């Protein structure tokens, strides 16, 4: 009798687990299904897929699994925000022509932030939303330092450009993508405080007018969102954290290792204090991140659902 009771209990317990799991699976169906396709845009030295490793590690797959249409753009790894923006615009136009969609939801990381802003500014009719993650909207102290240390027109600048071009050529080779024109000095200029503020004069949509506030939530029919991390060393198992920690010393304010928190603000600031560094924001280095913070992939899923709830 005791054995029968145990078997019945186990059966009921197993059934409840299966039912709970099934219910969870069903509840996730369509969770990320936005009205318009999502386009992910990489930052400086970025790529779509490099030697089998995604720039947005595991993110497109997770979003697609529960209903989203996701496309990963590939623009110049190094170039001005405007040049990268024109490349992205051409890809957006092609995507809309193929899919029949009317608009896209643009999500950009790092230099991808200004890049997607450019597209939304010149063709707001094609963009439903702009989401910047760790975006450089008021410059980076790192870019300022590099520009200040390497004199314009110097031999050291020529050497640095040569090394950068070699790295970018390797990225193009390993990513198997289109060989976009590269201009390391243009990208450096774009990411300095001076370059960013100049860009903002021409493309001001969503940029906060205060030092560390929020920008307009909606401009020309386009919704603007942003979020970022505010930590440098987040997991001792991640070797890239050493670099993030050292580079982060350049700042005298909260930062993610490459960009100051206040510089990442655009439109509606979802959060700017995640325990994530610049690479964690894209689930970088194969997903190694802080054990005491939300999984980066979850943030993208939640945001896709946010866009869905907004009818985007």
From Swiss-Prot:
Record field: catalytic activity: a triacylglycerol + H2O = a diacylglycerol + a fatty acid + H(+)
Alphabetized Gene3D superfamilies for the sequence: alpha/beta hydrolase (3.40.50.1820)
GO cellular component: extracellular region
GO molecular function: metal ion binding; triacylglycerol lipase activity
Group of enzyme by EC: hydrolase
Cofactor note: Binds 1 Ca(2+) ion per subunit.
Catalytic activity, EC: 3.1.1.3
Active site feature: 110, 256, 278
Cofactor names: Ca(2+)
Knockout-associated phenotype: Cells lacking this gene do not show lipase activity.
Positions bound to substrate: 44, 111
Disulfide bond entries: 212-262
Keywords assigned: Calcium, Disulfide bond, Hydrolase, Lipid degradation, Lipid metabolism, Metal-binding, Secreted, Signal
Other comment: The lipase chaperone LifO is required for the folding of this protein during its passage through the periplasm.
Function, in words: Catalyzes the hydrolysis of triacylglycerol.
Protein name as it appears in the record: Triacylglycerol lipase
Gene that this polypeptide is encoded by: hlyC
